[in-house]
């Protein structure tokens, strides 16, 4: 059980801890499953975190919370094992502010 940003306890199936990065995409882009990228969608290695999984992502040190989101894209660095997830943001500035952080990715519900 983890406690989300609202203070509510939540159960999860499993968690992964490691580096996460951020990305954004130009207008008209689509994710690897054909969805329009948006805040709340993240890129993962679908062999570790299935597409459609409901996730909750927060910093190991508690300094940053991405919150509840869905595994909706494939991340090249995630496929290589370099990161756990690539978090979508609307702007380059938001991505730069996030940078690269050690995060806990809670898999609340695996898959669709």
PLM feature spans:
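Solvent-exposed, well-ordered loop and adjacent helix/strand elements within mature globular domains
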Residues: 1-112
């Amino acid at each position: 059980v983890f406690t989300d940003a609202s203070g509510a306890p939540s159960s999860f199936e499993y968690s992964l801890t490691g580096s996460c990065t951020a990305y954004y995409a130009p207008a008209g882009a689509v994710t690897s499953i054909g969805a329009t990228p948006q805040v709340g969608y993240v890129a993962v290695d679908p062999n570790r975190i299935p597409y459609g999984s409901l996730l909750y992502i927060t910093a190991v040190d508690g300094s940053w919370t991405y919150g509840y989101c869905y595994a909706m894209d494939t991340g090249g660095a995630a496929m290589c094992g370099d990161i756990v997830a690539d978090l979508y943001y609307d702007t380059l500035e938001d991505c730069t502010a996030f940078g690269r952080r050690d995060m806990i990715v809670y898999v609340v519900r695996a898959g669709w």
